Swiss-Prot record:
GO terms for biological process, alphabetical: tRNA methylation; tRNA wobble uridine modification
Keyword terms, alphabetized: Cytoplasm, GTP-binding, Hydrolase, Magnesium, Metal-binding, Nucleotide-binding, Potassium, tRNA processing
Entry binding sites for GTP: 224-229, 243-249, 268-271
Protein location: Cytoplasm
Entry function: Exhibits a very high intrinsic GTPase hydrolysis rate. Involved in the addition of a carboxymethylaminomethyl (cmnm) group at the wobble position (U34) of certain tRNAs, forming tRNA-cmnm(5)s(2)U34.
EC code: 3.6.-.-
Family to which the UniProt record says this protein belongs: Belongs to the TRAFAC class TrmE-Era-EngA-EngB-Septin-like GTPase superfamily. TrmE GTPase family.
Cofactors, names only: K(+)
The protein's name in its UniProt record: tRNA modification GTPase MnmE
Gene3D superfamilies according to UniProt: P-loop containing nucleotide triphosphate hydrolases (3.40.50.300), Probable tRNA modification gtpase trme, domain 1 (3.30.1360.120), tRNA modification GTPase MnmE domain 2 (1.20.120.430)
Primary site of residence: cytoplasm
Length: 441
């Protein structure tokens, strides 16, 4: 008999309603003890008064009963919809402890759902992603994964490998029988096609992971080009210190933004220049490091200096760069249409002019570079590692070198894919996955 657990499934703190969840074989007994009544009709809310061991009323609320296996965890589950006060929470947890229930660990409800076959690992991860989603794009991706898109893709690959394994095993075990000569050729063709499909997903520039974790945009430029002022405009607050003194920014300053539904992390960096100051030089080194790792770069120039622009910043311009001429309110003369082959946007970070145009262009570029449509994508590093291992095994697949070895390569590939959904022994990764969860999930 597994332990019966409980947790607050809604947000902690003072609230109009608090939802408590119980799961395990003792849930029904605990619910009856709290209400002093028989269990309610399954999946129908009942208003009751909950009482402590001495019969004193704890609260007046709604209770629901979900008998196994028709529940989220696959176990007997009870939900208590009570008032969200601290006194109610303290009295309830004390009573649940008296009844032999223990507090749930983070992710324990979802872990039990997985172990009882209610969720595969990708859907369990999708629940965590949906809870953590801060933008519309993150929400949509989590819902697609929760709907089984990624699980269906991976299981389709795995099923195809199992069929190919069966064909090879037939050739091995029934060599004396009348096995069609085309069976082996068919399997080789299917395996090669599968490998190419997996490689396509590995080549997607980690877009699913970027969407989960945030798309990194780094602001680069010479000292006093207006990088910090631009960051503050984008953030809508004073995130960075703005000063007429060159070299004020010496460390990387990050702000998290919702850019048209896309999660982005914009980083302001130290001005690109040689400096005798050890601290400032370290800031410049970090700026170059962030630029190399960024998904997009904003190269900001002091427009009043055009055409004598900073050489170090010009060297940073590539296809993943937006070029910005700042201080357009002070500029004279014609504005160039492009610099180093990249279109130019002009703005005044100090006055706020042109910033909306930059935001719109950033959103357009992000959408064009990272949009994934409705197709399932790999959303975690562990997914990518597993698919890469499968591709490596399939790259070795060659029945001409021995059918037994070829069958083993297929088994290794199928096992790697099985780790994504949990179709193999994955006890070693469960703790890592479910540790990311909220307590009541």
């Amino acid at each position: 008999m597994s332990e019966t657990i409980y947790a607050l499934a809604s947000a902690a703190g003072r609230a109009g309603i608090a939802v408590w969840r119980l799961s395990g074989e003792g849930s029904g007994t605990a619910l009856s003890a709290l209400t002093g009544k028989p269990l309610p009709e399954p999946r129908r809310a009942r208003r009751v008064r909950l009482r402590d061991g001495a019969g004193e009323v704890l609260d007046d609320g709604l209770v629901l009963w979900f008998p196994a296996p028709h529940s989220f965890t696959g176990e007997d589950v009870a939900e208590l919809h009570l008032h969200g006060g601290r006194a109610v929470a303290a009295a309830l947890t004390a009573r649940l402890g008296e009844l032999g229930l223990r507090p749930a660990e983070p992710g324990e409800f979802s872990r039990r759902a997985f172990l009882n076959g209610k969720l595969d690992l990708t859907r369990a991860e999708a629940i965590a992603d949906l809870v953590d989603a801060e933008t519309a794009a993150q929400r949509r991706q989590a819902l697609r994964q929760l709907d089984g898109g990624l699980a269906g893709l991976v299981e389709g690959w795995r099923s195809a490998l199992v069929r190919a394994m069966a064909h090879l095993e037939a050739v091995i075990d029934f060599a004396d029988e009348d096995i069609p000569d085309t069976l082996l050729e068919q399997s080789v063709g299917e395996v090669r096609s599968l490998r190419r499909e997996m490689e396509v997903h590995l080549d997607e520039r980690r877009n699913g992971e970027r969407l989960r974790d945030g798309i990194h945009i780094t602001i680069l430029g010479a000292p006093n080009a207006g990088k910090s002022s631009l960051l503050n405009r984008l953030a809508g607050r004073e995130a960075a210190i703005v000063s007429a003194q060159a070299g004020t920014t010496r460390d990387v300053i990050e702000v998290h933004l919702d850019l048209g539904g896309w999660p982005v992390i914009v980083a302001d960096t130290a001005g690109l220049r040689d400096s005798a100051c050890e601290i400032e030089s370290e800031g410049v080194r970090r700026a170059a490091d962030r630029a190399a790792k960024a998904d997009l770069r904003l190269c900001v120039f002091d427009g009043t200096l055009y055409p004598n622009l900073d050489a170090a910043t010009l060297e940073m311009i590539d296809d993943a760069t937006l070029v910005v001429l700042n201080k357009r309110d002070l500029m004279t003369g014609e504005t160039p249409a492009s610099i180093n082959g990249r279109p130019v946007l002009t703005l005044s970070a100090k006055a706020g002019e042109g910033v909306d145009d930059l935001v719109a262009e950033l959103a357009r570029v992000v959408e064009s570079r990272f949009a994934m449509g409705s197709a399932p994508v790999l959303t975690r590093e562990r997914h990518r590692v597993a698919v890469a291992e499968a591709v490596a095994a399939l790259s070795r697949f060659d029945p001409g070198l021995g059918i037994e070895m070829a069958a083993e390569d297929l088994r290794l590939a199928a096992r790697s894919l099985g780790r994504i959904t949990g179709r193999v022994d994955v006890e070693e990764i469960l703790d890592v996955i479910f540790h990311e969860f909220c307590i009541g999930k």
